[in-house]
Amino acid sequence: MVKAICVVKGAVVNGTIIFSQENEGSPVYVNGTISGLSGGLHGFHIHEFGDTSNGCLSAGAHFNPFHVEHGGPNSAIRHVGDLGNITSCPSSKVANVLIQDNVISLFGDLSIIGRTLVVHENQDDLGLGGNLSKTTGNAGARVACGILAKI
């Protein structure tokens, strides 16, 4: 079993997310809470660099080692880092995160440990929209981020 923690911080958005994976090839479970979000859907992605020296901007693009188009978490073609959306309750401004993903890994050369988790301002269109959809999902500004650390 490998586990990682990510403490995400932004101007008003913050939270803690735990990643766990039983063994290489098994699903990764992602759970935690993000608070301070506006109500609705928000893009939730692993970005390529473990760098927050210039805020969330220095995290680079979505983690995409196979150089394919952006998609949703259940798409046949997607970036490794494409985790889709999290949903924030309009009244509490809290998103309870519970994701099971079969593409990301905490093992090997493609491990997401040491990379940056980014929470976006807007809904990820899962690669189904126009313009930047095939690279960013049109998810908008980066409102919080943090680097995954092994625990």
Swiss-Prot record:
Keywords: Antioxidant, Copper, Cytoplasm, Disulfide bond, Metal-binding, Oxidoreductase, Zinc. Pfam families: Sod_Cu (PF00080). Zn(2+) binds at residues 62, 70, 79, 82. It comes from Dictyostelium discoideum. The gene is sodD. Disulfide bonds join 56-145. This is Superoxide dismutase [Cu-Zn] 4. GO terms for cellular component: cytoplasm. It is found in: Cytoplasm. Homodimer. GO terms for molecular function: copper ion binding; superoxide dismutase activity.
